Amino acid sequence: METLLVVLHVFILFLLILGLFVMQKKHVSFSKRVFTALGLGIVFGFALQLIYGPTSNIVIQTADWFNIAGGGYVKLLQMVVMPLVFISILGAFTKLKLTKNLGKISGLIIGILVATTAVAAAVGIASALSFDLQAIQVDQGSTELSRGQELQQKSEDMTAKTLPQQIVELLPGNPFLDFTGARPTSTIAVVIFAAFLGVAFLGVKHKQPEQAETFKKLVDAVYAIVMRVVTLILRLTPYGVLAIMTKTIATSDLDSILKLGMFVIASYAALITMFIIHLLLLTFSGLNPVIYLKKAVPVLVFAFTSRSSAGALPLNIKTQRSMGVPEGIANFAGSFGLSIGQNGCAGIYPAMLAMMIAPTVGQNPFDPVFIITVIAVVAISSFGVAGVGGGATFAALLVLSSLNMPVALAGLLISIEPLIDMGRTALNVSGSMTSGLITSKVTKEIDQGAFHDQSRVIEAEEA
């Protein structure tokens, strides 16, 4: 009987996927299809949970089958992350028109990303203190304890090395190993390797322009192919979101989620506040935030539902281009934003965790010196955070271990991790685009006509 029910559930999922496919054939917008998938997944997941319970064999077996679509989609995103990061950084150098501004452009982008991460940390701290979040308020179940032990082990592996040794670890001793994502710092290592190749290209361009042009054509060709692969994966987003949301809701412990509801509310209050700050920064830079919102919605929706900053990179770059950002700057901002200064995952989240855990170690969370220390540590630790699932955890481990706090307590939030990760990812992408826009405005490279052309709104299929 159980097998028949599992088959029935898989058949229902197949019918829902078929419905989404029909919507695509009717040219329903990408954003609408993704939100439809999100809604269907939530309803279907709740139905399975209410009928059978999250721990029943039927739900567990059904979730296992659903994971072929959901987990497969995530694997495909992970597959393309390193090639995407590498070729985007390298492509940014080959597409850069004014090499004399290279230092200023890259410095501005990185500076804005890190500065906004520091602001995001302050917002996260304010939110945690306002909502009086404390780790001792949360009960530890077996899942939370298991997750805590896993994080503790990861932290011990990281803290076994001194700070100078950890800095050296950022460098790509073997770039081919880092292309496999084997190390926690693989993403930033690939960025550094690509940047070295890019700088070398600029040098060759002056001395041997013919060879540089050949290399540029090769990079442009690989860039086009990688972007095409990513576009094919992006088109699977509604189906992946449907399967992921159904599985997540069906297997979630609703009691734990309700108990942690205050943390979810506080997190989204901080995320929304930081997003408003992005809009204010654009306004102060002389850019219309309403136009930004209209053009940014598709990529922010994709980031929210996919929970992958890296997967959103092509759409991120195309969206910046539609707002008049030059191709080179758009590539730099999008690519650097994957591993440096993620406002959500590396800013708000670790800062809120630090405030929650502080009272458990006898630290007064309202101490100004402690607050400044947390902001500084968060900003510095924001280098090297990966743009695919797990980046926030890595950032939290770095921050908490640097502050000598028990990292195991971060495992308390495992039940709501997917829920808050959606908002964090959208904020990461917004921060990346904001840095590109402001940099373009400051360097006077922005195309104002393209920015104000509200007919240029990019959907995922166009990425």
UniProtKB/Swiss-Prot annotation:
It comes from the Bacteria. It holds the Pfam family SDF. The chain crosses the membrane at residues 3-23, 34-54, 73-93, 105-125, 184-204, 225-245, 262-282, 338-358, 369-389, 394-414. Keywords: Amino-acid transport, Cell membrane, Membrane, Transmembrane, Transmembrane helix, Transport. Induction: More strongly expressed in the presence of methionine than in presence of sulfate. Strongly inhibited by seleno-DL-cystine. GO terms for molecular function: L-cystine transmembrane transporter activity; symporter activity. InterPro entries: Na-dicarboxylate_symporter, Na:dicarbo_symporter_sf. It is a multi-pass membrane protein. The keyword Transmembrane helix applies. Belongs to the dicarboxylate/amino acid:cation symporter (DAACS) (TC 2.A.23) family. Mediates uptake of L-cystine, the oxidized form of L-cysteine. Although it is more specific for L-cystine, it could also transport a much broader range of amino acids and sulfur compounds including S-methylcysteine. This is L-cystine uptake protein TcyP.
